[in-house]
């Protein structure tokens, strides 16, 4: 199925912006698609796609978290820190007014590196953890949630101090406070964040 065919299929089937879980689940089941649901969004995937469709939920939250996340991505691009965020784009707007977004398909992985590199990495990670800027940003940035020390130190090591300072300011300014291990991972060897809308209650 091409992206246009997917869009046309959604446009012909989803006629209400306030789409409910059961209706979307039935739509996905009848078209051989998989659906996953979080607190603020639905995700639709197909084994043939290299992207994931994201549809905002309005049944239990009032904010459009996809629009917030997309705006965050565009702002990250302007600041030059987009490489730490999983790429996303606007897929289209359905006739009912519902905006659909897409994100690169992502398989969660821990970085698989050999033992010698792992030992070297651990030494570097320990060194980074002792840095004042690391301790300060890691302790204060995330509103009670925790990214693993390994992920944060790895990001610090790969992207550098200036980049991570910019990143920390950005997450604070945009209220991206729910950065925890379910929202971060690795794409290849690169630390990335796949959910960066924040949670606003």
Which ranges hold each PLM region?
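Protein kinase-like catalytic core scaffold
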Residues: 51, 84, 101, 175, ...
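Catalytic activation segment of kinase domains across protein kinase-like and atypical kinase folds
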Residues: 169-201
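Conserved hydrophobic "DFG−1" position in protein kinase catalytic cores
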Residues: 45-46, 55, 102-105, 186
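ATP-binding glycine-rich loop module of kinase domains
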Residues: 31, 37-82, 86
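Active-site ExK catalytic segment of metal-dependent nucleases
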Residues: 52-59, 104-106, 195-197
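ATP-binding glycine-rich phosphate-binding loop
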Residues: 2-49
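Short amphipathic alpha-helical segments that mediate assembly, nucleic-acid/protein binding
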Residues: 3-7, 21-24, 148-152, 160-164
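Conserved structural core of kinase catalytic domains
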Residues: 80-160
């Amino acid at each position: 199925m091409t992206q246009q065919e997917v869009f046309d299929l959604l446009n012909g089937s989803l006629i209400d912006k306030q789409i409910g879980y059961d209706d979307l689940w039935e739509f996905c089941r009848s078209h051989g698609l998989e659906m996953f649901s979080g607190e603020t969004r639905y995700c639709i995937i197909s084994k043939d796609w290299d992207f994931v469709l994201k549809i905002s939920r309005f049944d239990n939250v009032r904010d459009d978290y996809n629009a917030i996340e997309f705006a965050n991505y565009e702002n990250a691009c302007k600041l030059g820190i987009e490489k730490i965020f999983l790429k996303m784009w606007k897929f289209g707007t359905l006739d009912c007014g519902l905006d659909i977004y897409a994100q690169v398909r992502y398989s969660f992985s821990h970085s698989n590196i050999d033992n010698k590199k792992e030992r070297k990495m651990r030494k570097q990670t320990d060194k980074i953890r002792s840095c004042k800027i690391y301790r300060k940003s890691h302790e204060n940035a995330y509103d009670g949630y925790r990214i693993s020390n390994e992920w944060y130190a790895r990001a610090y090591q790969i992207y550098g101090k200036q980049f991570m300072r910019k990143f920390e300011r950005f997450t604070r300014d945009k209220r991206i406070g729910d950065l925890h291990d379910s929202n971060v991972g690795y794409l290849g060897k690169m630390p990335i964040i796949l959910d960066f809308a924040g949670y606003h209650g």
